[in-house]
Each structure stands twice: as structure tokens, then as C-alpha cells.
Amino acid sequence: MNDKHGATEFGLVGEVPYYATIFTTRMTSNLDGYEETADRMAELVNAREGFLGMQSARGDDGLAITVCYWRTEEDIAAWRNDLEHEIAQDEGRNRWYAQYTVEVARVDRTIGFRRPS
């Protein structure tokens, strides 16, 4: 979990509304260069205006889900159109992803619970 603005292991705790992009992928067997590119994208996204945090999970079956939290839809669009990110997207389509979906959701409410230690 990338903690930038009140993000927790289970999501973002903070001022609503905000937006979430949900990137669900099924990987191919060709992962050459993937980790390096993913690390670079994480570095870049952390520097973006409006980026609030990220969480990811990956299964042994190649299914991966990454949720990024954003202040506005304009911030999401700016990231989508970042030149280095666009190049990485092309690489993903050409080499690493068998399939993917991107969903964008507005978060109007968060509810959480944590058992005291």
C-alpha cells in the first residue's frame, strides 16, 4: 500500500469525495521488463498532482488488481495522458497483459473498522 494522504491497507481514509481507478489485469507469461516499468510508474504517479495513494494485490494465477486514489477526474486524465505512462500502456498491451479493464469510480463515503490490539 502506498500511503500518501491517509491511505490504509484497506483503502483511503480522508475527505470525500475522491475518485478511484481500478485496474484489473491478467498477465501473460512474458514479464520481461515489467517490474522495472511498474516501479517507474509508481515513482511517477507518486509525484502527480492529485494522487492520493495506491494499493495492489496479485494472485498466483496472474490476476492483479491495482486501485489508485485521486482527488479529481482531471487528475486521472492528466495521469492517463502522461507521455511516459502512455508508453508503458503500449508496452502493457503489446507484451504483459493478456487482458485488462480500467474502472473509474467516485467515492462519496468510506466506512471502516479496526479491532483494538
What residue ranges belong to the model's regions?
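Short S/T/G/P-rich N-terminal loop/turn motif that feeds into the first structured element of a domain
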Residues: 1-63, 73-81, 97-117
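Conserved RNP beta-strands of RNA recognition motif
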Residues: 66-70
